[in-house]
Amino acid sequence: MTEQPLSSWNTPARVGVELVELRRDDGHPIDALWYPADEPRVGVLHVHGKGSSVLTGPSRFLPPLLPEIAHLAVNMRCHDLAYTVGTDDWAVDGGMWEDLSTGHLDLAAGVAHLRERGVEQVVVSGHSSGGFYAADLMPRDAGIAAWVLLSPLTTNKNPFPLWWPDPEDRDRAAALARAMVAEGRGRDLIPVSGWFHAISAASLVQRLEEPDGIWLDNVGHAAAPVLMGWGDTEPRHALWNDLFRQFAGGSDRRLVLAGADHYYRGQERDLAAAIAGFLADAIG
C-alpha cells in the first residue's frame, strides 16, 4: 500500500481487495469486500448506513487506514436506494425496500465469514444505520470482541416529521401503508418528500411499529467494550451524549471529533487512529 496518491476519502487511491459473495442463513446472497492482513487475528466487519454501500463512508476509508488488521465490508441488502438483483425485473432490493427485521442476518453472514477466515477477534463497526444494525446483533452474538458505533442511528422513525410535517398526512400515509400490506402489496412504493424519495409499504409499517427505545435496550446487551463516536457538528450530538451516559460501563469509550460531520470528511485519519487506540485497549 502506498501513501500517494490519495483518494477523495484521504486514503490511498489503490488498495488490494477481494470481492466475496456471502450467504445469509435464509439463502440471500450478500456481496462484500475482503481486505486481508498478514496475520488476521483481528478482523473488523464494517456495516454501512441507509443509502450507502461498501464504497462510501467508514466502510470505504477505514480499511486502507488500518492495514494491520483484516476487514470485511458488507453490502447490506438495503445498500443504495434501489437496485435489481438477479434477472427478474421485479426482484428489487435497496434502501426503499429495507427489511428491518432481517438486517441482522447480513451481519451474521459477515461475522461467520470472518471466523471462517481464521479471525480470532471479530469487531463489528457500524456507521449511521449500520450502528442500529450493530446494536440489533448485540443480544444475538455474545462472541463479538468489541463494538464500534459511529454516528449511530437510534430509531428508524427519524424521517417522519420531514416526510410528513402535518401529523394528519402522516396518519394517512400510515393507514395507506397498512392497507397495502394487508392487500399483499407490501413491496409497492409510497412517494415521500425529500431523501429517500420513496419507501415500500412494508418497510414503512416496520418503522411505524418499531418499539420505542429498542436501540438502547439492545446496546445494554453488549458483552464487549463499545466505542461510540460522532462529530460535534452533528444535530444529534446532545442525544448521543445522553445515550452514552445511559449505557456506558467502565470499558466503554466515547469519541467526539471536533468539527467532524456525519461522514468524517477531512478527519478520516483521526477517526482511524482513535479506533486503533480503542481496539488496542479493548482486545490488545
Language-model segments: which ranges?
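N-terminal cap/lid segment of alpha/beta-hydrolase-fold proteins
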Residues: 2-37
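The alpha/beta-hydrolase serine catalytic core
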Residues: 5-9, 16, 95-104, 143-276
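Short, surface-exposed "cap/lid" segments of acyl-processing enzymes
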Residues: 38-77, 85
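Glycine-rich His-Gly loop
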Residues: 46-50, 128, 231
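Short beta-to-alpha linker loops that shape the active-site pocket of alpha/beta-hydrolase fold enzymes
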Residues: 75-86, 153, 260-261
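Catalytic nucleophile-loop/oxyanion-hole region of alpha/beta-hydrolase
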Residues: 80-119
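Short beta-strand immediately N-terminal to the catalytic nucleophile in serine-hydrolase-like folds
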Residues: 124-126, 150
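Gly/Ala-rich beta-loop-alpha elbow adjacent to hydrolase catalytic centers
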Residues: 126-130, 134
